[in-house]
Amino acid sequence: MTEQQSPPEQMVTGEGAGERGGNYKITIYELENFQGRRCELSEELPNVVDKALEKVGSIQVESGPWLGFERQAFAGEQFVLEKGDYPRWDSWSNSHNSDSLMSLRPLQIDSPDHKIHLFENAGYTGRKMEIVDDDVPSLWAHGFQDRVASVRALNGTWVGYEYPGYRGRQHVFEKGEYRHWNEWDANQPLMQSVRRVRDQQWHQRGSFENS
């Protein structure tokens, strides 16, 4: 059954610049495949309903990256939105737990360099893995366990995943310290793959080491 769509109705908000001077632009659509009412954003939106959208059915990121959230006020499951088209909810959700995306904000990239420390236990104790300017699709394959209970993001912005191959729930780590897994809203200290969130102009190959 084909649903008849009317031409998109457009709204624009924001000034087009992030806090660090970078440009951010994203278009959210109420229906799948870039149909229905739409809204162009260049700044955070705590509730898509404020822009007269009942939901988000598809997304086009012109410049970013952005971070989407399952619930209003930047709560719930997180979804990293990098430059490109997302025609359906399952194109931005790696866990496929929920088709809801109700708030979003620009994701700041503080540096072209990336360094992160993963710790086995809370409080930065136990085994440690350092990753520098690299993506790791499987912590197990590189000699580390799947238990990550605290994190130090020293440079750059990272996203950790519940399962290998960048699958499952996503958890974003902006530069800072995360003493306990509840500080990144995880239900348990489980992380099996990690990658950088990068500006498209940066393509560096890096390294990792365990201790």
From Swiss-Prot:
This protein's encoding gene: CRYBB3
Protein name (record): Beta-crystallin B3
Subunit structure: Homo/heterodimer, or complexes of higher-order. The structure of beta-crystallin oligomers seems to be stabilized through interactions between the N-terminal arms.
UniProt keyword Repeat present: yes
Region (Disordered): 1-21
Record-linked InterPro entries: Beta/Gamma-Crystallin (IPR050252), Beta/gamma_crystallin (IPR001064), G_crystallin-like (IPR011024)
Organism per entry: Gallus gallus
Spans annotated as Connecting peptide: 109-113
Alphabetical list of Pfam families matching this protein: Crystall (PF00030)
